[in-house]
Amino acid sequence: DPGCLPDWSSYKGHCYKVFKKVGTWEDAEKFCVENSGHLASIDSKEEADFVTKLASQTLTKFVYDAWIGLRDESKTQQCSPQWTDGSSVVYENVDEPTKCFGLDVHTEYRTWTDLPCGEKNPFICKSRLPH
């Protein structure tokens, strides 16, 4: 595509690539930054359709979700920090709070799903079109 590196795809001034190597959300973001981009942000239905198509074409026969650049930055759990009986939370047994988002393999990458950030998945990088 004009302006993008070989095997990257262009859409409205940005370049995209789906990487099959798997990593945690942090690993994936770091890798994208090293390749002059970030994990993909998705700002419209049209862009979502473009990224979905790219992911489903690249990740055929894959059983993984695919990381995008969305993460819940809040440090607290999404739900209110209190038991239903009113007692406060003094003990937690949570593997890892679910705070990172990926495209869901079960819907052929059409919908977003929240996942533990430490899960290892392929990912989609997005960078600005070099001028």
UniProtKB/Swiss-Prot annotation:
Tissue and organ distribution: Expressed by the venom gland.
Keywords: Disulfide bond, Hemostasis impairing toxin, Platelet aggregation activating toxin, Secreted, Toxin
GO terms under cellular component: extracellular region
Entry's Gene Ontology molecular function annotations: toxin activity
Alphabetical list of Gene3D superfamilies matching this protein: Mannose-Binding Protein A, subunit A
Domain C-type lectin: 11-126
Disulphide connectivity of cysteines: C4-C15, C32-C125, C100-C117
UniProt keyword Disulfide bond present: yes
Pfam family, one: Lectin_C
Subcellular locations according to the entry: Secreted
Family according to the record: Belongs to the snaclec family.
Quaternary structure note: Heterodimer of subunits alpha and beta; disulfide-linked.
Function as written in the Swiss-Prot or TrEMBL entry: Snaclec that binds to von Willebrand factor (VWF) and induces its interaction with GPIbalpha (GP1BA) (via the vWF A1 domain), resulting in platelet aggregation.
Name of this chain's protein: Snaclec bitiscetin subunit alpha
Organism of derivation: Bitis arietans
